[in-house]
Amino acid sequence: MEIDAVPMSDTPRKILVTSALPYANGPIHLGHLLEYIQTDIWVRFQKLRGQQCIYVCADDAHGTAIMLKAEENGVTPEQQIAQVKADHERDFADFQVNFDNYYSTHSPENRALSEMVFQRNKDAGYILEKTITQLYDPQKGMFLADRFVKGTCPKCKSEDQYGDNCEVCGATYTPAELIEPYSSVSGATPVEKETTQLFFDLPKFEALLREWTRSGALQEQVANKLQEWIEDLQPWDISREAPYFGFEIPGYPGKYFYVWLDAPIGYMASFQNYCDREGLSFDDYWGKESTAELYHFIGKDIINFHGLFWPAMLDGAGLRKPTAIYSHGFVTVNGAKMSKSRGTFIKARTYLDHLSPEYLRYYFAAKLSSRVDDFDLNLEDFAQRVNSDLVGKLVNIASRTGNFVKKFGGTLSTELDNMMLVREVQEAGPRIADFYEKREFGKAMREIMALADHANVYIADKAPWSLSKEEGKEQEVLAICSTAINVFRLLVIYLKPVLPALAERAEAFMQVEPLTWADSEQLLLGHEIAKFKPLLSRVDMAQVESMLEDSKESTPAPAAAKPKKAATQKADAADNDETISIDDFLKVKLRVARVAKAAHVDGADKLLQLTLDVGELGQRNVFAGIKARYAPEELEGKLVVLVANLAPRKMKFGISEGMVLAAGPGGDDIHILSPDSGAEPGMEVR
């Protein structure tokens, strides 16, 4: 649901915001941080505008993985989650992520609310009991989830594959289909064993989910994806057998709530804890008739839980559903999946040991949009953009003019030299607010930096450093520099959701109270400021390289209990930049093709269907993942490069007969490679 920025009024909006709960079995890394920084920026914007916006989160503290991790570390699960929670809170605080309440799912509030949601759904007839067969570890005396079973893929015969899908060939299967399965917990051969489990009757909510997923509460890409699930809704297993770290289900001794039942209820529990402390009404936000706004920020990997199970469970329990769920993509580094061997699997603490959190907050903001596209952290671009935008543009305004104000008495003039420039910056405020509201942070940053460019051009044209040497020009210099400081102040207000610490330093320099969005309507005239001190240092690529090196060193060597699987061997080869022979390269046949027709693909988030004219080779049908970057009408008539001898691939939407070459990390940052004019369809690319 997209909401236009609401004009500031005397009646603030009541907003509750959550981020997905980080799992309490390991440290925060940069892939996690994208979501928390995105959410924090949006929340800070709302608060800066005077809204009553509450941001809660918690550690996801239950499950088999935490129980086993605690056992591995020689501590109790309670000790394990307490230490991890402290580490998480420290990392979030140092990245300036400001929760109103940070809690744990292992809490009395979460137990009570989980039992309430379960019992209400049970009373309404939405809980089933079914006897099923599962794999069981006879050595550990426990049932095994799919991801705790490994073996040889039944399709491609790759070893050491998980019990639900093969990472080498992509095949999906059941754990029972694995060849030579073994428990990744003990190494024992699992056996099949019957067990009676509890299920949430999700198919009963099909009509509700069809309506709700198309109500505007989800991004279009997410809503389209969830339709695939809705076509085949199945009862959802919500119980696990002992031994298990979590909450035992009342009336079912030895059975525990599955972590994905009590984890989202953790949002409610953290808010309940906040309400008890602050004297707020829980029902005002979660009751069926609540008029408060409720937003969940999540990653695209958990949209099924939040977009299907969660609203259905809430409805079954007589509670309200979210106003909207905002999903984001995965983080890549330098165009590739985060890699421990390359040092790009960067922990939050390792980053903080080398670089300012403000750099990452700004870079995330500068590239984030409201879409679900993956996010590439290109480290060279990261350094260049921070240095250019923040140091070279924003801070430069104050550094070039602040000391001239001090030189001529330290007080800003009562009249400005260029009111047209100042009004231009003020009038941009509503547009920037609208971008923030719609999570189009990248557009907001581009607008702000364009204004900073205008200010720097103005300063360069006026050259106060030259005028200051001329006798009798003091008041003119002061008016020029006062104009620049007023523009700087406005830009700081607009950037405050992204850079709260820099804003605080700027407020100290300007000697003003903490700025709010409403302050953008006023000017700073006849006001004394402090001596300018550097507000931000430049990114040094040596710091970045040192961070990457430390990320490599901090990665423990993998256990050698099993031979390397095929996927790992392939990854190692890629890490070593393995070369190929010219004969290998010549096997790939590249041809010039012209896009005869381009069209959207119904039900596909990323694909366009291209009909390509390949000269004497005839026409080819190709599905290309370029929808985020190109409209169909932009492509028709365009020359492209086609991999012409790629085996046809059967896809859900049809047969793809080749691949179009493109550059870039993906999403809306992708660029089709196009031959020079003169090339003709069918020509071979050499």
Curated annotation (Swiss-Prot):
Q: Which residues bind Zn(2+)?
A: 153, 156, 166, 169
Residue stretches making up the tRNA-binding domain: 584-686
Catalytic activity annotation: tRNA(Met) + L-methionine + ATP = L-methionyl-tRNA(Met) + AMP + diphosphate
Query: A biological process (GO) annotation for this entry?
Result: methionyl-tRNA aminoacylation
Q: Where in the cell is it found?
A: Cytoplasm
* Protein EC: 6.1.1.10
Keywords on record: Aminoacyl-tRNA synthetase, ATP-binding, Cytoplasm, Ligase, Metal-binding, Nucleotide-binding, Protein biosynthesis, RNA-binding, tRNA-binding, Zinc
Report TM segments: none
Short motif ('KMSKS' region): ranges: 337-341
Where is ATP bound in this sequence? 340
The record's HAMAP family line, in alphabetical order, gives: Met_tRNA_synth_type1 (MF_00098)
Job of this protein? Is required not only for elongation of protein synthesis but also for the initiation of all mRNA translation through initiator tRNA(fMet) aminoacylation.
What is this protein's name? Answer: Methionine--tRNA ligase
The source organism is Alcanivorax borkumensis (strain ATCC 700651 / DSM 11573 / NCIMB 13689 / SK2)
